Amino acid sequence: MKKENLEEKPFLQMKGISKFFSGVQALDNVELKVYRGEVLALLGENGAGKSTLMKILSGVYTKDEGDIFIDEKKVDIKGIKEAEELGISIIHQELSLLSNLKIYENIFLGSEKYKGIFNKLDKDYMRSESEKLLSTIGFTADVDILAKDINIGEMQMIEIIKAISKKSKLIIMDEPTTALTEVETERLFKVINKLKSEGICIIYISHRLDEIFQICDRVNVLRDGKYVGEVKVKDTTKDDLITMMVGRKLEEQFPYKKVKKGDALLAVNNLSYKNKVKNISFEVRAGEILGLAGLMGSGRTELAKTIFGEYKKSSGDIYINDKKINITSPKEAIENGIAYLSEDRKKEGLILNMSVGNNISLCNLKKYENSIKKINKEKESKEIDDYIKKLSVKTPSANQIIKNLSGGNQQKAIIAKWIMISPNILIIDEPTRGIDVGAKKEIYEVLNEIKSLGKAIIMISSDMPEVLGISDRILVMSEGNLSGELSREEATQEKIMKYAVAFSN
């Protein structure tokens, strides 16, 4: 149950917060308050200033203007340690557990306990205390297991326990359900409700608006680095929140574009990969977006990586323009006009410490070589700038380090990288994961533009409205099998789900 009668005095209040980076204003007079035992949603498009504001609160950045109050007492947060001493913890979207440490070692990392005159690590105490802490949120695990051997949902629980172990009074959760299953999300929500009942404040950042109505009490909205307003969840609607976030109504959230279909550009026949992909056959045509739906673990990504040559097929055939092709590596796939955009853009799609421009031109450097194999920088820069403009990548310049861009702009840069090589077949895995509603629409428009040029797109997505909204045709996978095919006209969420569980036990 959501808390309705919030106490009058906020635990945290941020007033008039402003922040500048190299003369560019990232936050402009932002307000935020949160009460004990409340879940406050912090909403805004990518680039709205949410991360910057939370980094100020958690001590990663210092504010340039404004005041922060904890229990009505003015505080000056100058570092992460100071924030933690004030009871503020943050659980980042990219979880921070050290994979080669055990669970109990991760929980006590930085606050290890020692015993005896020789100051020896008190492992027994840390083990037993870790087990007690885990039990407080109804979670059991072998605390001697290495972090690399547990799943994302379990990692999330350990991160929460780390925050609790530090006696946190306020926990910031940044996109906590991005990689969670439905069952893991439900478990997380139970834990959040338990924390609420103990008077702990939660600031909850998510692009999944349905979750806001499930778990949050109030919503604080930012846009373009400015405070837009706050509203109680019970007094608002999804459409109202979208309007607050983007400053306009998204009447057409999924801008479908009808394009005349051409011949099959790609066909696969009885394609298999180990026990993950089982005798799959389909084709995708020029001017078509083929949606690929299914539950997590259904084999969609494995199918994509097998076509792209990242995984070696066990059996079956791949045809491009009716010609049988043997693809044994991504390099061969690219040479045959196939591009693949991974679901994990930060690990597999980008080199985070490189510039936007270098990331975009990375797969196409040969194009800029002159007769002595030297890169023509002027030609490269011009084309990079053209693609930045064409895809509306919001960046101060092509020289900006790409990790500083919002998720939506990073994704557009990856798309620019791949369409720069002029592929005929684009496989895109979870194209809008972790991207705000405004940037999603921009991505859909880019995909529509690509298909209108006579290219074929295979779009893997776990976002059901997205699959229904922009696909021309939908294939559904279940347990490695192709369980169903639906035309745009006949497809519904119910039909997709029926096929998605067709091969489940």
Curated annotation (Swiss-Prot):
SUPFAM superfamilies in the record: P-loop containing nucleoside triphosphate hydrolases
CDD domains: ABC_Carb_Monos_I, ABC_Carb_Monos_II
A GO molecular function held by the record: ATP hydrolysis activity
Subunit organization: The complex is composed of an ATP-binding protein (RbsA), two transmembrane proteins (RbsC) and a solute-binding protein (RbsB).
Membrane topology (UniProt): Peripheral membrane protein
EC number(s) per entry: 7.5.2.7
Subcellular locations according to the entry: Cell membrane
Annotated ranges, domain ABC transporter: 12-249, 259-504
Protein's recorded name: Ribose import ATP-binding protein RbsA
Entry similarity comment: Belongs to the ABC transporter superfamily. Ribose importer (TC 3.A.1.2.1) family.
Superkingdom of the source species: Bacteria
Functional description taken from the UniProt entry: Part of the ABC transporter complex RbsABC involved in ribose import. Responsible for energy coupling to the transport system.
Binding annotation for ATP: 44-51
This protein's encoding gene: rbsA
InterPro entries: AAA+_ATPase, ABC_carbohydrate_import_ATPase, ABC_transporter-like_ATP-bd, ABC_transporter-like_CS, P-loop_NTPase
Keywords: ATP-binding, Cell membrane, Membrane, Nucleotide-binding, Repeat, Sugar transport, Translocase, Transport
Chief localization: membrane
TM region positions: none
Catalytic activity: D-ribose(out) + ATP + H2O = D-ribose(in) + ADP + phosphate + H(+)
Chain segments annotated as coiled-coil in the UniProt record: none
Entry annotated with the keyword ATP-binding: yes
